[in-house]
Amino acid sequence: MQNKPIPFHISNVNHGLAEVQGLIHIKKNHLILEFEIKDALGGFIKSDLKEIDIPFDEIESLTYKKGLWGASVKIEGNSMRTFEQIPESEQGRCELKIKRKDRNEAEKSISSARVALSEYKLNKLEE
């Protein structure tokens, strides 16, 4: 499964002093979150690029919600460790915001990722 990467952001990191900008890559049996943290004041100070591989085994659910100004992708993991490296994640869940201009492409990609996740879980049950 090769979908176009989905741009995302997480605002109000470190009490509004930083924000996360990144891409969601949807692969056959896993998601890859690639991101960097920037200061919110000018974006001049950046962290190193981080990449987190999340196997479908560690994902409980994947949802997409369209809003008036954008959308959000919510990923729920099987463990708190699944998203421990992602800022603002808590209790094994993370929410990634999608800008309005990217939401239609994101909706298609997340829909196909949900199908792939369901098929993966069904195949695991049959084993």
Language-model-derived ranges and their functions:
Residues 1-5, 11-23, 44-127:
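Acidic, Ser/Thr- and proline-rich intrinsically disordered linker/docking segments
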Residues 20-36:
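Polybasic phosphoinositide-binding surfaces of eukaryotic membrane-targeting domains
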Residues 36-38, 59:
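Histidine- and/or cysteine-centered catalytic micro-motif in compact active-site loops
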